[in-house]
């Protein structure tokens, strides 16, 4: 491709990347262009070129796609958060479905995966593996129960908060993200006013100076409880009682804490927590299970869709109350406790010690006694418990990080031979890879369904059910009725002639 930086060109967007950038092609050369939509014809400016692909900036939409809409957020193009705001929600769901389906077919080699348009049709019309319609939201806004806002200063030294521009640490000022709860705006303005009043400076990455680095806000959607955690570059927040007094007057405020992070790092939260108001956690529900959520807890950010996601996982697990279930990468026990009410025993495995403590506490507050949690890596705990202690599994549920399951973990699952494996995935490429591994070793995909947990972004969750292809215990023979009676007559004749 004979093009250099700042050259302009025209291209039609044919596809989108996992991070929501439009993909256009010129004579086999691939361009990635942010803020474009499938079907757009655009003018773009070259930013960077590689041997077979390059990056360009959108200059002008020459012919808009039928799927293009006006973004609601005023900083949509500058912010690194919502990559798909310029695409209609219906088309977003279609894009995510296609992405997962194509990965499963191309990477997972599931050529026989049938797409089903209506729920319920799969049982009678599609005897093999089925790909069910994506579970979307009626209103894909204000769905996030968690937000982390960086604090910094603009070129004039004024305190700003908002979100980072894509692939940078430049803060785009925005105190009201339309994906977050409305209380975020009031909380951020109160903290910003407090900092200005008492001359408390925001953190500066370059000089490792200043105090306030980030503010974490969480809300229990079912309980209405609010949590605020200030991440500080120090051990003391001057005049903190003034801030607490203001924050606690916000309706629902339940917990206020400080996270001490004095390291030169991009990691947001520190290891030391100082609780300055409330119990140090909030509570929320998924279904009828109550969860305690601390500042460090992993908890799904979209509660409405989480209930759909876990409900689907529970359905695919097919529990009758007699099964032994292993829940790998279990976090604070969200799926484990959801399953435990319908299983004989659930074992959860998690590498983060705080999450395991939270999981055990969540089991206690719900009175769930048939669950046990192990601290450690899934690829170490599962082989140990199976090979040394002989613990079996009827169902295995996995919900790994984006990198997918470790091969040793998958190998142990195959050796254990559970009837069903329920795979919850946040990355369809690694899902497809791991599904291929299991299918090559005695399992078959039965159902796949996407859940739009992260509306207006390029990410999607997927639930996949695999069943064990065990040999039938009996031989099934289909015999025509006339053949049946002919055989019976011959048997009678043979018996009479003996």
Where are these regions (language model features)?
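Short, solvent-exposed loop/turn elements at beta->coil junctions and helix N-caps
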Residues: 132-140, 205-206, 214, 218, ...
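Internal alpha/beta scaffold segment
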Residues: 170-213, 234-260
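Terminal RNA-binding accessory module
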Residues: 1-75, 119, 124, 372-373, ...
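Short, conserved phosphate/pyrophosphate- and ester-handling motifs at nucleotide-, phospho-/glycolipid
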Residues: 39, 180, 302
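Short, aliphatic-rich beta-strand segments
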Residues: 217, 224-233, 290-294, 395
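Extended interfacial segments that mediate partner engagement and assembly in macromolecular machines
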Residues: 59-71, 77-202
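Short, acidic/hydrophobic/Gly-rich beta-strand patch recurrent on exposed beta strands
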Residues: 22-27, 162-165, 229-231, 359
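Rossmann-like S-adenosyl-L-methionine
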Residues: 2-7, 18, 239-498
């Amino acid at each position: 491709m004979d093009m250099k930086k700042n050259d302009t060109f025209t291209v039609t967007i044919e596809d989108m990347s996992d991070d929501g950038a439009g993909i256009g092609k010129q004579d086999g050369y691939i361009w990635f262009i942010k803020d474009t939509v499938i079907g757009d014809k655009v003018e773009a400016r070259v930013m960077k070129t590689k041997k077979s692909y390059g990056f360009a900036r959108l200059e002008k939409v020459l012919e808009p796609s039928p799927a293009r809409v006006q973004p609601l957020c005023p900083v949509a193009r500058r912010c690194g958060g919502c990559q798909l705001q310029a695409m209609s929600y219906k088309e977003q769901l279609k894009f995510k479905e296609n992405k997962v389906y194509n990965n499963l077919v191309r990477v997972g080699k599931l050529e026989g995966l049938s797409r089903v348009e209506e729920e319920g049709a799969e049982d009678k019309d599609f005897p093999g593996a089925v790909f069910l319609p994506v579970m979307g939201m009626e209103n894909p806004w204000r769905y996030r129960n968690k937000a982390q806002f960086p604090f910094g200063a603009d070129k004039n030294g004024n305190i700003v908060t908002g979100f980072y521009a894509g692939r940078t640490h430049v803060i785009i000022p925005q105190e009201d993200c339309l994906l977050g709860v409305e209380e975020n705006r009031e909380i951020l303005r109160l903290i910003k006013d407090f900092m200005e009043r008492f001359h408390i400076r925001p953190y500066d990455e370059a000089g490792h100076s200043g105090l306030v680095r980030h503010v974490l806000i969480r809300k229990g959607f079912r309980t209405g409880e609010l949590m605020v955690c200030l991440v500080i570059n120090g051990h003391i927040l001057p005049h903190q009682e003034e801030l607490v007094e203001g924050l606690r007057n916000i309706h629902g405020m339940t917990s206020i804490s400080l996270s001490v992070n004095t390291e030169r790092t991009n990691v947001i939260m520190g290891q030391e927590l100082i609780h300055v108001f409330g119990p140090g956690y909030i509570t929320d529900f998924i279904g009828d299970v109550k969860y305690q959520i601390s500042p460090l807890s992993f908890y799904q950010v979209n509660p409405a869709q989480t209930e759909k996601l876990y409900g689907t996982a529970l359905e695919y697990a097919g529990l009758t109350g007699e099964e032994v279930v292993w829940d790998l990468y279990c976090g604070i026990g969200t799926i484990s406790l959801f399953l435990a009410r319908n299983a004989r025993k659930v074992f959860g495995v998690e590498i983060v010690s705080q999450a395991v403590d939270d999981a055990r506490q969540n089991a206690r507050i719900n009175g769930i006694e048939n669950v046990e949690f192990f601290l450690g890596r899934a690829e170490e705990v599962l082989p140990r418990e199976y090979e040394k202690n002989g613990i079996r599994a009827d169902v295995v549920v996995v919900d790994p990080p984006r990198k997918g399951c470790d091969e040793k973990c998958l190998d142990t699952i195959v050796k254990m031979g559970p009837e069903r494996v329920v795979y919850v995935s946040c990355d369809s490429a690694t899902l497809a890879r791991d599904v291929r591994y299991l299918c090559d070793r005695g399992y078959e995909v039965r159902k796949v369904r996407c859940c739009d947990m992260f509306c207006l972004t390029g990410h999607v969750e997927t639930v996949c059910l695999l069943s064990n292809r065990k040999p039938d215990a009996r031989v099934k023979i289909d015999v025509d009725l006339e053949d049946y009676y002919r055989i019976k007559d011959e048997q009678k004749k043979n018996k009479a002639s003996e």
